[in-house]
Amino acid sequence: MAIELNVGRKVTVTVPGSSANLGPGFDTLGLALSVYDTVEVEIIPSGLEVEVFGEGQGEVPLDGSHLVVKAIRAGLKAADAEVPGLRVVCHNNIPQSRGLGSSAAAAVAGVAAANGLADFPLTQEQIVQLSSAFEGHPDNAAASVLGGAVVSWTNLSIDGKSQPQYAAVPLEVQDNIRATALVPNFHASTEAVRRVLPTEVTHIDARFNVSRVAVMIVALQQRPDLLWEGTRDRLHQPYRAEVLPVTSEWVNRLRNRGYAAYLSGAGPTAMVLSTEPIPDKVLEDARESGIKVLELEVAGPVKVEVNQP
């Protein structure tokens, strides 16, 4: 029998955004970034109250279909707990549908909130599994759960009927690596951007990406001078260029100047990893083009603060 949690118990969750793929690591590599959503969840006597401030305000649903609410319920079920009612207040800073892990952060925030409400019965591995299930791939969610960089993977069931299993391991990241996000003023649909990908790739391109993923792991951990080489890709970015021409232009422009630029997730954000600040002139050119610039650091894991009644 599920345990009913006490009215008045409240948690505050701070969850980082993330960048997925990092060039060659399609649906595998992720990096937590210092742009955060904060979610306050309180157990109330009955009903559901949802408020959203910041990114997505006036656009996202304010009922049980909100991703944070769905993730809270999934987390409570996994924790064998139930509540009479919930108040959920979201303060969003992660740009939505821009390739910065906003939906994964929402899923992580919900599951982590449920874990805090239930007095933390879930492991990090379970939180990665539950939150990744909403995405269908673990790279963004695992980065937000574990912090830093992650290598993630998916095991599909043999019979095709069981839930895929998601897992990840963290990577140490050199302290001097920073991220600069160039965020265009339009959304990108992950589903639409995935549709342009081919169903098959050549052995040469697969081999190219396998080697660059290995280089990228070394670059993050100990050789940041290899970031440019480690962000090269042949599996997804060349195909997505046709539907994200603005991003592709900026990625190419930056790479031609020696910067480790790549398409962040499904875009449209262009991300640069570096050990030195990007010159002001480059960033000013981006801003004059209507692009928002976020100068970020590698972030730590999701945090949960419990406020007892």
Curated annotation (Swiss-Prot):
GO terms for molecular function: ATP binding; homoserine kinase activity. It catalyses: L-homoserine + ATP = O-phospho-L-homoserine + ADP + H(+). The keyword Kinase applies. PROSITE patterns: GHMP_KINASES_ATP. It is found in: Cytoplasm. Keywords: Amino-acid biosynthesis, ATP-binding, Cytoplasm, Kinase, Nucleotide-binding, Threonine biosynthesis, Transferase. This is Homoserine kinase. Pathway: Amino-acid biosynthesis; L-threonine biosynthesis; L-threonine from L-aspartate: step 4/5. GO terms for cellular component: cytoplasm. ATP binds at P95, Q96, S97, R98, G99, L100, G101, S102, S103, A104, A105. Pfam families: GHMP_kinases_C, GHMP_kinases_N. The gene is thrB. Its main location: cytoplasm. Its EC number is 2.7.1.39. One of its GO terms (biological process) is threonine biosynthetic process.
